[in-house]
Amino acid sequence: MSKYAIIETGGQQLRVEPGRFYNIRHFVSLTPNELEQNTKILIYRVLMIRQESTIKMGHPWLKGAIVKGRILHSCLEKKITIYKMISKKKTRRKLGHRQKSTRFIVDSIFLNGKEI
């Protein structure tokens, strides 16, 4: 817990540490055929970086902060069931949906060109 960053990607904010992997619903900047294994990614939307006891916050993002990582694989999340029923009409509809997600690993966090 000595260093971590809070990033914004895929419509959500994540607390990321180097060497750990995370699931994200979708990368806006990548097309589906670019989501292959070991594709290197750079995330520039870094909201905050903590290194030991110092905290640097952006407004809204930190300038010169980059989170480098690579894609491990694409996967599907757990299936949810949608059930619609209209009473007194004998109308029932049951649907399922699985959200596509991408698993990536964070390799390093950079601030102003230096790895923290």
UniProtKB/Swiss-Prot annotation:
GO cellular component, one term: chloroplast
GO BP annotations listed: translation
Matching PROSITE patterns: RIBOSOMAL_L21
Molecular function (Gene Ontology), one example: structural constituent of ribosome
Matches recorded under SUPFAM superfamilies: L21p-like (SSF141091)
Protein origin, superkingdom: Eukaryota
Localization in the cell: Plastid, Chloroplast
Main localization (coarse): plastid
Protein keywords: Chloroplast, Plastid, Ribonucleoprotein, Ribosomal protein, RNA-binding, rRNA-binding
One Pfam family in the UniProt entry: Ribosomal_L21p
Entry-linked InterPro entries: bL21-like, bL21-like_sf, Ribosomal_bL21, Ribosomal_bL21_CS
Family: Belongs to the bacterial ribosomal protein bL21 family.
Assembly description: Part of the 50S ribosomal subunit.
Role, per record: This protein binds to 23S rRNA.
Official protein name in the record: Large ribosomal subunit protein bL21c
Taxonomic source organism: Marchantia polymorpha (Common liverwort)
